[in-house]
Amino acid sequence: MSDIIRIKRHFYVHLLNNNTNVTKCMLGPQVYTRKEHERCLFEPRQCVVVPPGHYCVVQNPCVRGEDNIPKVGESEEVQLRMGEKEIRFEQPPFPLLPGEELLTVDGEWLFKLKVIPSNKGYHVRCTRDFVDSTRVSVRAGEQWIVEGPQTFIPRVEVEELGEVEALTVESNTAIKLRARLNFTDRQGVARVAGEEWLHRTSGAYLPAYEEEFVSYVRGAVLTEKEAIHLRALRNFTDVYGKARKAGEQWMITHKMSSTHIPDVNEVITATVNAIILSKNQYCIVKDPVGDEGINQFGKREVRKGECSFFLRPGESLVGEVQSMNAIGKNEALLLQALEKFEDCGGTVRMPGEKWLLRGATEYIPRVDVCVLERRGVIALDKNEGIYVMNTTTGEVRTVIGEPYMLKEHEVLWEKDLSPDVEELLACPTGCCRCSERDPNFTSSRVKHRIIRFNVQHNAAVQIYDYKQKKPRVVLGPNLVMLSPDEEFTVLSLSGGKPKALNSLLALQLFLGPRFSSDTIVVETSDHARLQLSLSYNWHFDVNRENPDAKIFSVPDFVGDCCKTIASRVRGAVAAEDFDSFHRNSAKIIREAVFGRDGNGHVRNSLRFSANNLVVTNIDIQSVEPTDAKTRDSLQKSVQLAIEITTKSQEAAARHGKERKDQEARGRLERQKLVDKIEVERTKTQWLELQAQSEVVQASGQAVAEAKAKAESLLIEADTELKQAEMRAKALRITAASDLAKQKQQQDLELEFAKRQNELEIVKARELAQTEVERIQRMVSAIGRQTLVSIAQAGPEMQAKLLGGLGLKGYLITDGKTPVNLFNTAQGMLGGQTTETKS
């Protein structure tokens, strides 16, 4: 490096004095001649330039005095603060003094100042004590938030921990904050560590470091139909200025505020909807709140419409909102007193007392009255009824054929029947087979309705009265109604073939005539066992005027009758051999069943005196041996007879078939001959037609050519004729079109001229009218007297002028201007006439 160092403006170099080992800084612009004991440590460097909005960090900065000039030691060396850092902001370019260094991060030494936007801040912490211009003293470890909008000015004593965003507090929303330590917030309120509070102001809020965000608290919207219940968590004064005790509950409605944000010292226990009662509604409130704001536990209150209210804390609704009891003319309410009270009519009601409130009226029950049920008039036809029990005496009676309303001491009594009777009543005929019964049958009968049963024609029903201990028999057709103490007599009859016990249940006994069938097994004297299928016709001999209960004396009259007849038949058959019985079975069985009279004749009927049952006829439907051998021999004989009959029928059928075949073959041969004759006739006709065709074919070609040529000429002539017609038609259409066009044009021109003339006439008329109006308006504007004066002004002036000149008249003319002597003479005559008159 040369001894002459040229230092430009804003450049510097460091020179080391080898004698004193002290480095000094030379700042341009200058030209410096290096001495022998001095050494230039580097080429001239540009001064450090910090532009606006930037800063740099200088390590080991120099010590400056109050005048901001670096301090120099005894050896003229610059004093440094070793290990320190200094942040330098925008200033004139400056050199780095010996010992000073620029702090570089990732090769960059110039840093841009950070701008803190609105609603944001920087969380910073003090690393060592210092005194700030805004803070008297800042101790190491303190933390705070630098709020925007501003430019963040860094300090070496402060480190940046991170960026903090502001919290947005929306309308009807608050944020819950908690104190990290004891401090005084921005509103000047002293906060204790752990204390929580709400920030309710809408907008952006940047919490201080001492404030910890807990959560957002959304307010409850209060309307005419919604309110909230609150409970105090601790003693405090709410936002409405009212002192609250811990555990106290209260209600906030829309009358106090449209919205409510719950404080940290209170909690929403419930959101309640308004109970709206119309004019015809009411409700019962349990534990109502009194005038002092305290629940009256154990009490109830009836609230009637029209109104709307909210249930306060501790209150509850008994049941639901109920409609006012509108009692019709044929209705009543059964009421019961819960406590002793005096009603509006002055009647004292004792606890448990019941009474009826009859309509027509409207009724809202008191809190000490219980509505047991609504009763109405039960409409009953003449064949309908109900069972009514007196709850005081226990007596049960029937009400039939008239509308009835139960009294306060009466209830509907349900009459129970056995399952058999219930199922039989559900059957149309009043009877059913045991095999067809439904095990899951459930009666749909209304039990308090009187039990009715339609007795069919020619049937009887027995009803037993347990109170009077006697039965009664009803013959059909009739309608039976049971009193409370009566029951049906159920018949259990035998059924099937052979008869089986308890196969059929019935409420009514059919009197007949009817029939029964049975199958019995008998044995002849030669030990042939036979199975007989018998049918009996029977009926009951009953006095219609006074039926006797004797017909119901035998519960299973079918089984008893069949057993009796079977016994008699077996006895009679046992005395006969098989052949004799097979030939005379009907006579033997009829004689055995009916017996003989005193004259030895077979009777016509069998009478059972126990129940007046009469069997009038017996029919043998079939007789079959039960022994296999006997059955086989009978089957063989029957089969042999069938075979003989079948063979004779087959022979007759074969003979008839052969005869029909011969007749068919004859008809077929005859038809063949007829067909051959027809074929020959058709062939002859075909040959004749073929000959005619050949003749036509021979002369057809010349005729065809002549016809074709003639037709061609005819077509050409027709074509020319049609073309001429078309041309004439076209000319005619063109001429007609031109004529119509000219006519239309002339009509339009004539119409145009006519309208133009009319317009001219209208125009002239309107101009004349306008001129007349103008003259009239001018005359009316000038005035008649004025016009007269104007008209007389000329002659008068001339007369005066002539009078002044002493002339009677005058005439001025030359040789070129003619004189109208006629007018002059007339004027003269007029003048003379005037003078004569005057």
UniProtKB/Swiss-Prot annotation:
GO terms for cellular component: cytoplasm; nucleus; ribonucleoprotein complex. The keyword Cell inner membrane does not apply. PROSITE patterns: MVP (PS51224). MVP repeats lie at residues 13-52, 53-114, 118-170, 171-223, 224-278, 280-328, 329-381, 382-426. Keywords: Cytoplasm, Nucleus, Phosphoprotein, Repeat, Ribonucleoprotein. It is found in: Cytoplasm; Nucleus. InterPro entries: Band_7/SPFH_dom_sf (IPR036013), MVP (IPR039059), MVP_rep_dom (IPR041139), MVP_rep_sf (IPR043023), MVP_shoulder (IPR021870), Vault_2 (IPR041134), Vault_2_sf (IPR043179), Vault_3 (IPR040989). Pfam families: MVP_shoulder, Vault, Vault_2, Vault_3, Vault_4. The vault ribonucleoprotein particle is a huge (400 A x 670 A) cage structure of 12.9 MDa. It consists of a dimer of half-vaults, with each half-vault comprising 39 identical major vault protein (MVP) chains, PARP4 and one or more vault RNAs (vRNAs). PANTHER family: MAJOR VAULT PROTEIN (PTHR14165:SF3). Required for normal vault structure. Vaults are multi-subunit structures that may act as scaffolds for proteins involved in signal transduction. Vaults may also play a role in nucleo-cytoplasmic transport. This is Major vault protein. It comes from Trypanosoma brucei brucei (strain 927/4 GUTat10.1).
